[in-house]
Design a protein with these regions (language model features):
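Membrane-lumen/periplasm interface segments of specific transmembrane helices
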Residues: 62-79, 238, 242-357, 364-369
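Short acidic/glycine- and proline-prone juxtamembrane loop motifs at membrane-interface regions
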Residues: 192, 197-204, 385
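Membrane-interface alpha helices of multi-pass inner-membrane proteins
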Residues: 188, 192, 209-214, 222-248, ...
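Transmembrane-helix signature of polytopic, membrane-embedded enzymes
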Residues: 147-151, 162, 167-189, 207, ...
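Membrane-interface transmembrane helices that cradle and orient dolichyl/undecaprenyl
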Residues: 172-178, 212-223, 253, 403
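Short hydrophobic/aromatic helix or loop-helix immediately within or flanking a transmembrane segment
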Residues: 98-146, 319-325, 376
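Transmembrane-helix motifs of polytopic, lipid-linked glycan transferases
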Residues: 136-140, 154-174, 349-353
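Signature aromatic-anchored transmembrane alpha helix within multi-pass, membrane-resident enzymes
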Residues: 278-282, 405-434
């Protein structure tokens, strides 16, 4: 299995780069084969004000309905009559105060947020593993509301609603309205998308990545750089926008043609006046490393905590997949059904869609999906893969494009996703193995 996966990976990388050079306008006589040329020609459509208002309303309505559903599920699985009258905001908060939601740093900050650990025997700044942007946003909103919990929900709700607009806009301008509608529907029905409403980074990161894609499509490089900087302050994967932006810049500027025509100096001028803004993006990661260094004296202290407290060490993706398969082959439990099977299925789906994308999808999106998936599947003891892959957003682009002319298959997928959503959401609210 390891040899097969590595072989497929190497072949994919090789074919991807050949197509990349072809799309930078390699002269016809140098092209290896028509196989490496894009076989699709999607007709994008502009995002309208009506689209913006409609998607904002839809996203907000969905968040309200999901929160209402969470209360109903809580009341149904408990003694409905004895709990309904006494149900309070604190009860609602506790429904969503699970997994990483309990660890955010808005109130205490990194310095004052410590725990005594068994492996060191002293207080450690364990929560340095969490990036700072989401807590900073919560702290900002706390100026306007009295509760950190309310501030956190406000950040998540606003980020989700705005993110849906950028998501829809990016897909519509690239693929057209039909695929945009299907992509958004698949995203909303993704079995782990309820995490968008929690006190976690999912919604904020989703908003920033979607906005990054939207402005990369429009070649607004300064805006992309600023958004990417925020994204890399939100999660380490935010830095991927740098690669996505460079891919789009090099393809759109037709680098090889410019070299062939003796316009390399013109390209350099264009690069250093426009694309140079993309290099703002890694600053977010550097700020995070600086926080680690300032607090502990080690810029990579978060990796120590990940290893010793959360049992995460960096590994090659094939080792992660092999570990998941070993867990699946063991005794069946809720962990097997809610963590390991979904993670294996998601990996297979992502790999299949990447292969499908080689000749059919924009390279910037396949580059993001490949690197994002590799990062997520390059750790040991991956227990939150379903949640992490929520922001592998080209998954939804590619699936919608693939099923755009297959109405029955699309409807079956929507039905299956909705069913699994209900199962996973209920498990999350009732203490199941959903992280």
């Amino acid at each position: 299995m390891t040899i097969l996966l590595n072989t497929i990976f190497i072949l994919f990388i090789g074919i991807w780069f050949v197509r990349f050079f072809v799309e930078m306008d390699v002269p016809e006589k140098y092209r290896v084969s028509r196989f490496f040329q894009n076989t699709t020609d999607y007709k994008g459509e502009g995002l309208t004000k009506k689209d913006v208002l409609r998607i904002l309303f839809l996203a907000f309505l969905i968040r309200v309905l999901i929160y209402f559903a969470s209360v109903l599920i809580y009341l149904v699985q408990s003694d409905f009559l004895s709990h309904a009258a006494a149900f309070s905001w604190n009860d609602f908060f506790n429904l969503w105060n699970k997994s990483d939601a309990q660890h955010y740093l808005a109130e205490k900050g990194y310095v004052n947020c410590t725990e005594v650990t068994e492996w060191s025997g002293r207080e450690e700044h364990l929560f340095l593993v969490f990036f700072p942007l989401y807590p900073w946003f919560i702290r900002f909103f706390h100026f306007f509301v009295n509760s950190y919990a309310v501030a956190a929900f406000a950040v998540s709700i606003i980020s989700f609603c705005v993110g849906c607009v950028f998501f829809y806009g990016a897909v519509k301008e690239e693929y057209g309205a039909s695929i945009a509608e299907k992509s958004l529907t698949l995203l909303l029905l993704y079995p782990f998308s309820f995490f968008f409403g929690g006190i976690m980074t999912e919604s904020l990161f989703f908003c920033l990545i979607s906005a990054g894609f939207f402005y990369i499509r429009r070649h607004k490089w300064l805006i992309v750089g600023l958004i990417g900087l925020l994204a890399s302050l939100c999660r380490i994967q935010g830095v991927i926008l740098l690669g996505v932006g460079i891919v789009e810049f090099l393809i759109s500027s037709q680098l090889i043609r410019m070299i062939q025509e003796g316009q390399f100096k013109g390209f350099l001028k264009y690069f250093f006046t426009e694309a140079v803004w993309l290099f703002l993006i890694p600053i977010g990661n550097l700020v995070y490393l600086g926080l680690n260094y300032q607090i502990t004296g080690n810029a990579f202290q978060f990796t120590v905590y990940q290893k010793n407290h959360w049992y995460h060490t960096t590994t090659w993706f094939t080792n992660c997949v092999a570990e998941i398969m070993r867990y699946i082959s063991g005794q069946v439990s809720d962990t097997t059904l809610l963590i390991w099977y979904p993670e294996l299925i998601l990996f297979v789906v992502a790999a299949a869609l990447l292969l499908y994308s080689l000749r059919t999808q924009p390279l910037k999106y396949s580059a993001y999906l490949l690197v994002y998936t590799l990062i997520n599947y390059s750790v040991t003891f991956l227990i939150s893969g379903g949640r992490y892959m929520l922001n592998a957003i080209p998954l939804f682009f590619f699936t919608a494009a693939l099923l755009n002319k297959h109405k029955l298959l699309y409807q079956l997928l929507c039905f299956a996703s909705a069913l699994l959503y209900g199962i996973c959401f209920t498990a999350f609210l009732t203490g199941g193995a959903i992280y």
